[in-house]
């Protein structure tokens, strides 16, 4: 009777160990691949990320938004002229210099609007140089491999009883499902940021048309702060990945298997949470809203 029970126990242990090893083998593969692509994705300019989308957005901006920005610029500069005149004691103290001032501001505003796309892309080019410079300094190995974290995985599993093995099998199954969800979240952050970049740049001429006006100029200034925030969000993402790479390389190999699994899982969840926070942090740094 004991022989039969031992045979059943050994068979059940082999099944559970095989299932656990299978679950753990490719558990973090998709997450590792997604994290490994972060540095390459955030280091690209809008034109390099997807030239098709870039050309479409540029055509929309130049052919649809730019004429509207020209009309807004005419209204804004007319209001600016009225304000310049009325500020001088209701026309009782009018100097010719104010008209030269208005002509200069109008010319500067036209120059800004006509070169909006160059200005916007220049901001992202500057951000790209910062991100690429940081990538060479910060990014290390970000891959997680449970088999390398826990040495002699299969032999250590065979030494465990059926009860702990069953619990570990359920843990590995649950963590495997969670890693897919985390992979989707990382995808949303990285691609969502680029979509936001294209949306913001598509309407660039409108806020840039208000730069020369004292009252409306806040719109243009906040728009520029938003562009810088979007650009430097990529730098913050790189910092998050760099911190993550240090953490995963320092996972203790002396702990038990369950602890190693949940430590890897915890670090990946932490990375996902920090990636979501980079947008609000970048906007708060540049006071963009």
Positions of predicted regions on the chain:
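Membrane-water interface regions at transmembrane-helix termini and the short interhelical loops
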Residues: 81-94, 183-187, 215-216
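Gly/Ser-rich, low-complexity
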Residues: 1-72, 88-97, 107-178, 217, ...
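Hydrophobic alpha-helical transmembrane segments of multipass integral membrane proteins
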Residues: 74-78, 180, 201, 274
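Hydrophobic transmembrane alpha-helices of secondary-active transporters
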Residues: 78-85, 204-214
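Hydrophobic alpha-helical transmembrane segments
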Residues: 67-79, 197
């Amino acid at each position: 009777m004991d022989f039969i029970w031992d045979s059943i126990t050994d068979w059940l242990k082999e099944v559970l160990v095989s299932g656990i090893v299978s679950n753990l083998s490719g558990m973090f593969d998709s997450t590792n691949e997604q994290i490994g692509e972060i540095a390459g994705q955030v280091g690209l300019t809008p034109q390099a990320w997807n030239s098709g989308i870039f050309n479409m957005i540029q055509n929309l901006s130049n052919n649809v938004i730019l004429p509207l920005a020209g009309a807004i610029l005419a209204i804004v500069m007319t209001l600016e002229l009225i304000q310049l005149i009325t500020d001088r004691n209701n026309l009782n103290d009018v100097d010719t210099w104010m008209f030269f001032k208005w002509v200069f501001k109008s010319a500067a505003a036209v120059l800004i609007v006509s070169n909006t796309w160059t200005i916007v892309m220049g901001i992202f080019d500057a951000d790209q140089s910062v991100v690429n410079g940081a990538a060479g300094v910060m990014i290390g190995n970000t891959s997680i491999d449970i088999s390398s974290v826990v040495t002699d995985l299969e032999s250590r599993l065979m030494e465990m009883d059926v009860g702990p093995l069953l619990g570990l099998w359920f843990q590995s199954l649950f963590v495997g499902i969670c890693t897919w969800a985390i992979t989707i979240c990382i995808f949303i952050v990285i691609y969502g940021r680029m979509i936001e970049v294209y949306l913001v740049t598509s309407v660039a001429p409108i806020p840039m048309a208000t730069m020369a006006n004292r009252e409306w100029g806040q719109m243009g200034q906040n728009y520029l702060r938003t562009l810088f925030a979007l650009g430097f969000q990529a730098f913050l993402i790189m910092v998050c990945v760099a911190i993550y790479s240090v953490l995963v390389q320092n996972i203790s190999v002396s702990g038990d298997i369950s602890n190693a699994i949940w430590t890897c899982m915890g670090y990946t969840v932490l990375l996902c949470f920090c990636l979501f926070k980079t947008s609000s942090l970048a906007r708060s740094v540049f006071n963009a809203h």
